[in-house]
Amino acid sequence: LVGRTRQDPCMDLLRTPEDRFLGLPDWPYPPSYVTVDGVRIAYYDTGNPEASAVLLLHGEPTWSYLYRRVIPPLITAGHRVIAIDLVGFGRSDKPTSRGDYTYQRHVEWLQSVVVDHLDLTDITMFCHDWGGLLGLRLVANYPERFARVIAANTFLPTGDRSPGGDFLSWREFSQTAPDLQIGNIVNSASLTDLPPEIIAAYDAPFPDERFKAGARQFPVLVPITPDDPASRPNTEAWTSLARYDKPFLTVFSDSDPVTAGQDELLRKLIPGSADQPHRTVRGGHFLQEDAGPDIASILIDFIPSA
């Protein structure tokens, strides 16, 4: 599909053919869709529809498939599980121009799904990577909707401190690699050696380079200087997060150089993190691949029994 949106009449969109998603291992969940200003956003709503939602947010350059080993135990435990494919990823539409991807626009897209369309409350959020850069903005904007939060290998940068050499190296690679091989990137940043069919599932949303504008753009949207457009709104978000006193847990991995130490910063600044059983699990950046069942257990233990 190539279309134009009401939000921006010059926004060209691609939609990954559905047959790219057929027969993926361990992914039986049918998608639901909401269209926001002409952009179709996919999400997966499974489990007990009467229960409060566990919201799972992926990051760069993955899609909700990242949670395939986390979702089944949550369903068995009686929870409702909602995973959202960010715009540019998974089954969601993919603007072809990198300029159409902005930090603020991603926040608004996510807000449209979580708040305006699904109207979720009493949310338990698990956010990873860019899922945190966006999800924590929603927590700041709507703290009353979020009952508890788990942040995993993520942060909310304001551009006033260096992100570190490992992130800058990744940022440079993402801009200069002639072929951004998504599945191999996930494999290389996991301790687990992923089999070919799992690598292929991460490649599925991206038939060719035209579909990868979002994956290319996300790294340069991370604010690394104080004059970045996202610096001020993220700083304002921290004012709200500094008052968030509901349970806030960090679950980071022991082998992710990109986000190492960010868990300490989150725990220092967010009051809800006090006296929580923070965890460090064995894993690379994509800890869902290395410790998926452990993450599910942590989530189940974190949510009070009804």
Language-model region placement:
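Structural cue for short, hydrophobic secondary-structure segments
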Residues: 56-59, 83
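Active-site glycine-rich loops that stabilize anionic/oxyanionic intermediates
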Residues: 59-62, 129
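Flexible "cap/lid" subdomain of the alpha/beta-hydrolase fold that forms the substrate-access gate
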Residues: 11-30, 41, 46-47, 53, ...
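A short acidic, amphipathic alpha-helical/loop segment
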Residues: 69-70, 265, 294
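Short, Lys/Arg-enriched N-terminal segments with co-localized hydrophobic residues
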Residues: 1-10
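Short amphipathic alpha-helix adjacent to the substrate-entry channel of hydrolases
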Residues: 65-82
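Catalytic histidine-centered segment of alpha/beta-hydrolase-like enzymes
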Residues: 283-296
